[in-house]
């Protein structure tokens, strides 16, 4: 396998990573449809991604963005179909799933490239073992993180502003992480293969950190709002109770005077 082949992450790495990333979201959220429909939808989505990404692997820079738009659309429709989300919430979780998948595929292939470089050979069985082990570790951690974000909150309501924030973050992360692949002579592009891998992986990891930090912030703001709303309702009920009690006392006093 040549250096050029090693530099280009295979399409099926991304197809598997996107699928697993979306599965993490689906199986930590409330479902819109039954288990069998979700299973069928998972299979259809995976097959579509696998075929499309193998077909578009190594596509020209002109068609790169349209190809990514197709992939993102497939992921969005799959999440919306399976989860009890509004379109805004589906978009919010899609952005997280997409960047998570980008990081997983990038890190997994970088790790395999590192092994090939150290051993000075390409061993297919190690490629499979590496893929299974790295993906299992990454998505197990992401699953636990998503489950922890569900604590104390049944449903996360996303506003247009919050959706736009994560879209802008993801677009910036994706653009910066792919600069070296689209233009290796650019101002912010890496020259060596490992430099390119490091830039992409670290940028994707940073994007994940920012998105999860923002998710936590959105959750805390919503929890604070719900607590304040509940406190106001309880306060109003208490005031109404006090008024009712005072009215009853006045009526009783009048009856007593009579």
Q: Where would I find each of the regions flagged by the language model?
A:
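Hydrophobic transmembrane alpha-helical segments in integral membrane proteins
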Residues: 1-18
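Interfacial loop-to-helix junctions that mark the boundaries of transmembrane helices
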Residues: 5-8, 125-127, 192-197
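Juxtamembrane segments at transmembrane-helix boundaries
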Residues: 6, 18-39, 52-168, 173-187
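N-terminal, Lys/Arg-enriched amphipathic/low-complexity engagement segments
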Residues: 42-46
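Alpha-helical membrane-embedded segments
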Residues: 135-140, 168-175, 196-216
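Juxtamembrane or sensor-core-proximal signal-transducing alpha helices
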Residues: 141-155, 180-186, 204-236
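Conserved DHp (HisKA) dimerization/phosphotransfer helix of two-component histidine kinases, i.e.
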Residues: 237, 244-258
């Amino acid at each position: 396998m040549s250096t050029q082949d090693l530099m280009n992450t295979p399409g099926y790495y991304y197809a598997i990573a996107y699928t697993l990333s979306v599965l993490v979201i689906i199986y930590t959220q409330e479902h819109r449809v039954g288990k069998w429909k979700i299973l069928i939808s998972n299979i259809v989505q995976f097959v579509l991604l696998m075929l499309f990404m193998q077909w578009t692997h190594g596509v020209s820079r002109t068609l790169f963005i349209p190809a990514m738009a197709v992939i993102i659309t497939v992921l969005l429709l799959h999440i919306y179909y399976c989860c009890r989300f509004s379109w805004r919430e589906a978009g919010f979780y899609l952005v997280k799933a997409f960047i998570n998948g980008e990081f997983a595929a990038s890190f997994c292939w970088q790790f395999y490239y590192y092994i090939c470089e150290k051993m000075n050979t390409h061993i297919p069985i190690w490629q499979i073992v590496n893929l299974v082990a790295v993906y299992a570790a990454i998505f197990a951690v992401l699953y636990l993180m998503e489950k922890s974000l569900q604590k104390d909150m049944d449903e996360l309501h996303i506003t247009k502003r919050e959706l736009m924030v994560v879209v802008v973050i993801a677009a910036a992360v994706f653009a910066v992480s792919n600069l070296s692949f689209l233009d290796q002579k650019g101002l912010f592009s890496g020259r060596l293969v490992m430099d390119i891998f490091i830039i992409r992986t670290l940028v994707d990891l940073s994007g994940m950190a920012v998105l999860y930090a923002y998710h936590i912030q959105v959750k805390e703001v919503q929890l604070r709002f719900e607590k304040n709303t509940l406190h106001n309702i309880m306060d109003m009920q208490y005031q109404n109770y006090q008024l009712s009690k005072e009215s009853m006392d006045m009526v009783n006093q009048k009856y007593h005077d009579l």
